[in-house]
Swiss-Prot record:
PROSITE patterns reported for this sequence: PROA
GO CC, alphabetical: cytoplasm
First-listed, main subcellular location of the protein, grouped into a coarse class: cytoplasm
HAMAP family attached to this UniProt entry: ProA
Protein name listed in UniProt: Gamma-glutamyl phosphate reductase
Length: 417
């Protein structure tokens, strides 16, 4: 089965690579329109997935990721339309010039070819990834989690129908709908057909891909994100950022999971934090020093377990640790962070500059929420993933991250001397 999917995707990629920006946008507009026109079918499929997931004991955080509503589905369709408005990087000349030999040489952006994406219970990923791949002239093979099998199948049928109505092969966007985990291992060895693999899931999936894949892998999306409250931070303003970073949508990978508080501001900051977190329904997991100050406050507080500093809660839970200084905060982030998104809240710009220079994450913020690490917020459109590695892409992966380049030499029957 996968062999045939690979062949179909490879053949489709040759066709997609020849499309103009206008032709690709026409396809995307058709997909967006059909997602709305066929919304009832997709939402009914999703309702069945959610019901099964709830019956199987899936956590509330995962149920939130899985669930579609009419508003969310409309938002997904609108995101596809936003991709239409983005500049097409394919064909862009990165640099070039004329050599001494007279050969005109240029480096031009081209599609990668076929992208493979493995992801869990997030049905929006199906459309986000497909739209970005199509915009950049790439075919894609999707392998969603078993929790979203009905939703993904219904969504891909809508996308394929839109492709065919525009004269393009259905093989441009395909999904593996068999939940057999053995197929993941088989997919990881499809280097004959797949040019880049992107896993979007937990640490176990990333480890599996790194160890077994014969295809170049882009890992990321695991967000143990930190906010450091420096001793010069403005408490009221800092709390606004923390509430946003923790509670806006707790199930996302750019949500803050650990709050590091400078010891010199802890006495005045922690009572205010407790009050705010109680109002927001957040449970605090505090180290011994913070626990002593938080126990009398209104927020629910428990003693932090050492392993929780490495946890991506994806829920209304927040670690709180008192640190001695900036060096202590940076050391903690280096030990427990996932190089996703980390922030400092401070009025001391020297400390801010040190934090930016010394915290080696894909996105580092000064006096801003970690929630900004998002393709849409960065002006990249819908993202295919957030890469926490350094090759070939880093941070939110928009259109350019789905391209490579080729060298093109144009001569007049020019030969090398």
């Amino acid at each position: 089965m996968l062999e045939q999917m690979g062949i179909a995707a490879k053949q489709a990629s040759y066709k997609l690579a020849q499309l103009s920006s206008r032709e690709k946008n026409r396809v995307l507009e058709k997909i967006a329109d059909e997602l709305e026109a066929q919304s009832e079918i997709i939402l009914n499929a999703n309702a069945q997935d959610v019901a099964d997931a709830r019956a199987n004991g899936l956590s509330e955080a995962m149920l939130d990721r899985l669930a579609l509503t009419p508003a969310r589905l409309k938002g997904i369709a609108d995101d596809v339309r936003q991709v239409c408005n983005l500049a097409d990087p394919v064909g862009q000349v990165i640099d070039g010039g004329v050599l001494d030999s007279g050969l005109r040489l240029e480096r031009r952006r081209v599609p990668l070819g076929v992208i493979g994406v493995i992801y869990e219970a997030r049905p929006n990923v199906t459309v986000d990834v497909a739209s970005l791949c199509l915009k950049t002239g790439n075919a894609v093979i999707l392998r969603g989690g078993k929790e979203t099998c009905r939703t993904n199948a219904a969504t891909v049928v809508v996308i394929q129908d839109a492709l065919k109505s525009c004269g393009l092969p259905a093989g441009a966007v395909q999904a593996i709908d068999n939940p057999d985990r053995a197929l993941v291992s088989e997919m990881l060895r499809m280097d004959k057909y797949i040019d880049m693999l992107i896993p979007r899931g937990g640490a176990g999936l990333h480890k599996l891909c790194r160890e077994q894949s014969t295809i170049p892998v882009i890992t990321g999306g695991i967000g143990v994100c930190h906010i450091y409250v420096d001793e010069s931070a403005e408490i009221a303003e800092a709390l606004k950022v923390i509430v946003n970073a923790k509670t806006q949508r707790p199930s996302t990978c750019n949500t803050v999971e650990t709050l590091l508080v400078n010891k010199n501001i802890a006495y005045s900051f922690l009572p205010a934090l407790s009050k705010q977190m109680a109002e927001s329904g957040v449970t605090l997991h505090a180290d011994a020093s913070a626990l002593a100050q938080l126990q009398t406050g209104p927020a629910k507080v428990v003693a932090v377990k050492a392993e929780e500093y490495d946890d991506e809660f994806l829920s209304l839970d927040l670690n709180v640790k008192i640190v001695s200084d900036l060096d202590d905060a940076i050391a903690h982030i280096r030990e427990h962070g996932t190089q996703h998104s980390d922030a400092i809240l401070t009025r001391d710009m020297r400390n801010a500059q040190r934090f930016v220079n010394e915290v080696d994450s894909s996105a580092v913020y000064v006096n801003a929420s970690t929630r900004f690490t998002d393709g849409g917020q960065f002006g990249l459109g819908a993202e295919v993933a957030v890469s926490t590695q350094k090759l070939h892409a880093r941070g939110p992966m928009g259109l350019e991250a789905l391209t490579t380049y080729k060298w093109i030499g144009i001569g007049d029957y020019t030969i090398r001397a």
